[in-house]
Swiss-Prot record:
Active site residues according to the UniProt entry: C328, H425
Organism: Alcanivorax borkumensis (strain ATCC 700651 / DSM 11573 / NCIMB 13689 / SK2)
Pathway recorded for this protein: Cofactor biosynthesis; adenosylcobalamin biosynthesis
The protein's name in its UniProt record: Cobyric acid synthase
Family in the record: Belongs to the CobB/CobQ family. CobQ subfamily.
Top-level taxonomy: Bacteria, Pseudomonadati, Pseudomonadota, Gammaproteobacteria, Oceanospirillales
Record-linked Gene3D superfamilies: 3.40.50.880, P-loop containing nucleotide triphosphate hydrolases (3.40.50.300)
Keywords carried by this UniProt record: Cobalamin biosynthesis, Glutamine amidotransferase
Amino acid sequence: MATLMVQGCTSDAGKSTVVAALCRWFARRGYSVAPFKPQNMALNSAVTVDGGEIGRSTALQALACGVAPHSDMNPVLLKPQTDMGAQVIIRGKVLGNMQALDYHAYKNTASEAVLAAWQDLSSRFDVIIAEGAGSPAEINLRDNDIANMGFAERVDCPVIVVADIDRGGVFAHLTGTLDLLSESEQKRTLGFVINRFRGDLSLLQGGLDWLEERTGKPVFGVLPYLHGLTLDAEDAVDEQGAHDVGAFNVVVPLLPRMSNHNDFDPLRLHPQVNLQFVKMGEAWPSADLIILPGSKATRADLAFLRQQGWDKQIEKHLRYGGKVLGICGGFQMLGERIDDPEGLESDAGSSAGLGWLSMTTRLISGKQLRNVEGRFVAADTLIRGYEIHNGLTQGEALKHPMLVLEGRDDGAMSEDGRVMGCYLHGLFDVPDSCNTILEWAGLKSQRSVDYAVHREQQLDRLADMLEEHLDMTRLKQCMGS
């Protein structure tokens, strides 16, 4: 078994993309390969085959390997709820909420969970491609590090460092990062990968020669900027959508603790849809469909929505015949009240909902985590997705469910048919279900994208790019595989 770790000079340097590319490259050559991310901080997560929860990027990398996502692949997941606190998930299961200082003190215990997960994964796969988090050179985070070099040192695995040249300063990033590492960490660093290059490579060659001479480390490859690459994003929301004249306008309010924004990726690719995220202070655009997204702090995000005056805009939209869809936390907002007696998401208390569905929600411990499929009640079309929520919703509105999932009702639709919502994520991934929702909202003759097929094409594109631009023979030799 060989483990290679991909670290980055900065956040968003391309670590997740490079790991996905490596996973698909090894899988295509018959290796038994799996991704591993010791610690991740993200609001976008996926349900695993063993009933746990991991970061979305790691789940994508598992698909690149051709294996089902498993909790061992991301043993520590932190889901921010406030600027100072997060929900802590260990090996797929919720441990509880912690403030930053409390979690820092807990890291030694978390480190044991990371090591155990890596050992279990290593016993089942030939190759492990591990991914760091942020930068390994964050001086204030080096004590008890489990995300980057702390993990690499403990399991004695080699590391490659990725830098994004498109942002500028790539040589300062790489040399500065290496200089801030300890002697042993520098020794285990095999070399570098430069990501997102555009232009004539011959103009970069002098810099590459200087970098290799100064550091004594090879540049394994310069990866090109891939225009039009669309894969599941994990952190920042890609606010770009189609902007065709006469397109069907889908509007999503950008909430501070918005979660699982990957729900909207198929709409971003839809040739007839103009997907728009409305940010704080922006004018509310014309909309055919408004979608209230999932949230990791539903009551706080609902208060933010009201502070922006967006509730009035949505009410006006409904008054003029528009449609509103709520997903998970957004579904809870559509009801009359949200109760959080245990303070699971923020301070304990209750908040009035938007009141468009006759129902109330109580947040309870014991998160629901499942991959499910079923059918729309009104259209009898297939739906497939996943649930990640703490809410228990009750009320008259549930007598008119939106979905039937494996023999049980889910969601609700208003009597006038203009408002509906459910707990299910992934509503737009299957073309038939995407078409059903868009037709309900008023779009005829839909041409929805099969997102699973699209995702596979993008992963193959990454592996093809790696084949052409990365010296995999040399990298494999350095790995010892």
